[in-house]
Amino acid sequence: MKRRRLAQHFLRDPSVAEYIAGLVPSGLDVIEVGPGAGALTIPLAKRSKTVYAIEIDKALAERLRGIAPPNVVIIVGDALEVEWPRADFFVSNVPYSITSPLLFKLIRHRLPAVLTIQREVAERLVARPGSEDYGRLTVAVQCFYDVEILRVLPPYVFDPPPKVYSAVVRLMPKAPCVDNFDEFEKFSAWLFSARRKTLRRLKLADSTKRVYQLTLEELVELFKRHKA
């Protein structure tokens, strides 16, 4: 089954699957979202204590049960809605249509992660202040993670091949920049809805600096002053 409605493209290249699995430390409890036919699940299971595979498609989940080793626990449901089990690491070939909400849920769990996502989204995650890619998602993720693009993947390693390139990204938790993510995220969303306006125009500071030019540290300082 090709889940075009979810914009998911299944990994088909065994060498890429082995590469991604090899990025996960051995002996951990791992959550995998969107296992599909199990191309990544099987090599993950070989090096993990437990793999919790969250699959929304019942038919695919049943097919996976037929090939998965005993240390794979299959959870049928929507990864955005089901409660995630306690785990040490997170892995996903992320369905394009849920990339942002899945990232926001991941932030709340603060798990280290290896994700395969659209290259343009990956570039947003590592974007620097002042660039066109720098925005709300950048700030939210960089507040809690060190982000690194490890590898760019061509369309032909997926089935069906997407129209764009993908990227393997590693997210490693760091000391959070704020204590209250939900409040900070709402503030960032409001700010970046006016990304080209100056702080003076927004009556936040006597500065001609524009929102998209602010560093993470400057955004945090504005947030703290706004809360006070």
UniProtKB/Swiss-Prot annotation:
GO terms for cellular component: cytoplasm. One of its GO terms (biological process) is rRNA methylation. InterPro entries: KsgA/Erm, rRNA_Ade_Mease_Trfase_CS, rRNA_Ade_methylase_Trfase_N, rRNA_adenine_dimethylase, SAM-dependent_MTases_sf. It is found in: Cytoplasm. Its EC number is 2.1.1.-. SUPFAM superfamilies: S-adenosyl-L-methionine-dependent methyltransferases. It is an enzyme of class 2 (transferase). S-adenosyl-L-methionine binds at H9, L11, G34, E55, D78, N93. Disulfide bonds: none annotated. Keywords: Cytoplasm, Methyltransferase, RNA-binding, rRNA processing, S-adenosyl-L-methionine, Transferase. SMART domains: rADc. Its main location: cytoplasm. Belongs to the class I-like SAM-binding methyltransferase superfamily. rRNA adenine N(6)-methyltransferase family. RsmA subfamily. Specifically dimethylates two adjacent adenosines in the loop of a conserved hairpin near the 3'-end of 16S rRNA in the 30S particle. May play a critical role in biogenesis of 30S subunits. This is Probable ribosomal RNA small subunit methyltransferase A. It comes from Pyrobaculum aerophilum (strain ATCC 51768 / DSM 7523 / JCM 9630 / CIP 104966 / NBRC 100827 / IM2).
